[in-house]
């Protein structure tokens, strides 16, 4: 379960981890930030500063009987002065935590930048970042979440900009749907390179924005929206996916409902 499901103004990381474990999840996905933040340090919310000792954070996660599936480290790849140091540190941090993946996307591309210009800069960013990923054996999980990555053809272009066994896929089922794409076709096209999945369902008021947005931060409980989880799991199993379904939802209640539904789906043949 992604820790973004816990949206409180007065709860530290430990609160989220305790709730995740109590709900029956075995893995958590942590949200990373750089620099120091007083509110975070004081325990008002559960993001993790990458200036903190990662082994200290790992010990905290371990104490709740959890493992870290991935770190969420979205960075604007078309702005290498930001994304290269941020993603480099996220890779190092993920390795220390025992995670296998850094989840990110291409970020918001400035309106004045053409696609060709953006892809040239993103290529440079990836050429700098992927050698670090290869040394640490951490996957860069490209997530569909911005204007290029939410469309299958340009997602594949981004995915193949730099050849590396650690340039991989972290599909977000809800974002793909909200962008007006076919999530099942999308998954089938990238299935062999999927290392981590954002399990996000979509329903309710956001449905009216389909085709107008590049995704949503979080969805409804898995099984309470429009996505066919049996079909999604079938695609993943056919590709011999062995990674983690990291639920992204909007509340603790949705987290409980999601794991209940997904367990039923996973137990079915």
Report the location of each language-model feature:
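Active-site loop/turn elements of alpha/beta-hydrolase fold enzymes
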Residues: 30-35, 73, 106-107, 145, ...
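Active-site acidic/histidine proton-transfer and metal-coordination neighborhood
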Residues: 15, 21, 55-56, 60-67, ...
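Conserved beta-strand positions in the central sheet of alpha/beta enzyme cores
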Residues: 29, 70, 103, 141, ...
